[in-house]
């Protein structure tokens, strides 16, 4: 551990896509600079309220809302609340007195970054997706460095100092052993499928995945499933798999994602930036179904990073039918080497040192002046 005091403030959150990379960086910074060297500013309703304290970090929250998709009155109220949120954030920033700030996106990042800029604190902004959002494109003008996760994204920040770092993943995920696909799936060594749909699950997976897998099991295909599902559907889906002869675990939240990835031969998931980074880090082949309502269709762009190098497969939601999935998994069972190859290619895309690269860059910014 470095004994030189260095305090990092991380601003933003809301979803796992913003938080998990932030936590990966926070863990590395804490290793280098000590227990109380990281502080978070987030929103009052986001996942940060559970994940940040559980990871052992301090968190303060701002009353800031969402601008998109909730009607003009809501947007006007949100805009009206931004100035008070900036003043609230300014007090939080002054109390923690950080040496450097990292913005990670989410609604709380804007007032916190504006406050930090007003205090002359060096800042970096991390863009997780292959298509930068409007908020981050605007906030990039407050930051001295923009850090991106995908090739080509720096072009979306013209005139800004920009570096490709990759998207940090938690250390436990980076340590998942390489994929080892058998030459033949058997009852003793079945095809193991991991299904998840983000922090709220994905109802289309709850419907279509069992519709595809149960006929395969009836024809003797050896399959195991671990599936994240909305809490209201977990018990019914568990019974459905059990009655169809498939060994399955259905759960609203997968606590140990590293073990879940380690045990998976195939992943079926959305293609948020964190999921794509985790698929690469763990070297797991995947069928990615982009969330169709993601801003600027950024999930499809994220998935394309792996699809373009044959490190996974993408299927649009309107084309993700159970008959197609049944046929596709049948082909994978007949040719397991396809899974091995896709997993190895996916792992070649990983940037396992993204967290350390970001920490080193942030540390170098401490003495920078605007």
From Swiss-Prot:
Catalysed reactions, semicolon-separated: di-trans,octa-cis-undecaprenyl diphospho-N-acetyl-alpha-D-muramoyl-L-alanyl-D-glutamyl-meso-2,6-diaminopimeloyl-D-alanyl-D-alanine + UDP-N-acetyl-alpha-D-glucosamine = di-trans,octa-cis-undecaprenyl diphospho-[N-acetyl-alpha-D-glucosaminyl-(1->4)]-N-acetyl-alpha-D-muramoyl-L-alanyl-D-glutamyl-meso-2,6-diaminopimeloyl-D-alanyl-D-alanine + UDP + H(+)
Subcellular locations according to the entry: Cell inner membrane
Positions annotated to bind UDP-N-acetyl-alpha-D-glucosamine: 15-17, 129, 170, 199, 254, 299
Protein name according to UniProt: UDP-N-acetylglucosamine--N-acetylmuramyl-(pentapeptide) pyrophosphoryl-undecaprenol N-acetylglucosamine transferase
Entry's Gene Ontology BP terms: carbohydrate metabolic process; cell division; cell wall organization; lipid glycosylation; peptidoglycan biosynthetic process; regulation of cell shape
Membrane topology: Peripheral membrane protein
High-level lineage: Bacteria, Pseudomonadati, Pseudomonadota, Alphaproteobacteria, Magnetococcales
Keyword Cell membrane appears in the UniProt entry: yes
MF GO annotations: UDP-N-acetyl-D-glucosamine:N-acetylmuramoyl-L-alanyl-D-glutamyl-meso-2,6-diaminopimelyl-D-alanyl-D-alanine-diphosphoundecaprenol 4-beta-N-acetylglucosaminlytransferase activity; undecaprenyldiphospho-muramoylpentapeptide beta-N-acetylglucosaminyltransferase activity
Pathway: Cell wall biogenesis; peptidoglycan biosynthesis
Any Gene Ontology CC annotation: plasma membrane
Keywords noted in UniProt: Cell cycle, Cell division, Cell inner membrane, Cell membrane, Cell shape, Cell wall biogenesis/degradation, Glycosyltransferase, Membrane, Peptidoglycan synthesis, Transferase
Function: Cell wall formation. Catalyzes the transfer of a GlcNAc subunit on undecaprenyl-pyrophosphoryl-MurNAc-pentapeptide (lipid intermediate I) to form undecaprenyl-pyrophosphoryl-MurNAc-(pentapeptide)GlcNAc (lipid intermediate II).
